[in-house]
Amino acid sequence: MKHILCFGDSNTWGYSPQDGSRFPPNVRWTGTLQKTLGADYNIIEEGLNGRTTFINEEGEDARPFRSGSDVFSMILESHRPLDLVTIMLGSNDLKLEYDLSVEEIAKGAKTLCEMVINSEYLVEHPPAILLISPTHFNPEIIEDEIEIFGDASQKSHQFAEHYQKVAEELGIHFLDAAKHVTPSQGEGIHWDADQHIKFGKVLAQKATEILL
């Protein structure tokens, strides 16, 4: 059996742009990935709303453990052995309060990839790594999100360029999610159900190519 760890944020968790609820397992892209690949594969979901590459939230309403780099080593140990690790983070790093460039965010993503490469828990069976650049924000994101993200739409279009460079530097696999998925037109950041299903099928094909 092949074990695939999917590490990400709310679009891996399955956040519905309609009402903020969680899509059921058979709708989330990870569920579609499992269904498409079949019983010979074990898909491990590790999505968390608000997760970043390396920054924790601050303030009275801050949610704990949002920094991916703070928890990733533990997660890798918990789910070993692994054959493939997918990493799709960076959208939450675009929040105005963090004031980060996409290049800085890509460095955060690179650190996560290096944590897999250098993990003492994966030495005997090093997994392949797939770095996924996040989708583009819709320019007309809802008002509540504009207060948090500002004009992050332009920055989000830079993800693929910088993430691909990281993948090339580290000799790992790369996928641009924006070539396959678009966020909800009504909300602008999260994916509708049909996009989850579409992306799950894309990932199934990519994972098969990597693990052949």
Tell what function each PLM region has.
Residues M1-N49, F54-G59, M74-H79, V85, ...:
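Serine-esterase "nucleophile elbow" of acetyl-processing enzymes
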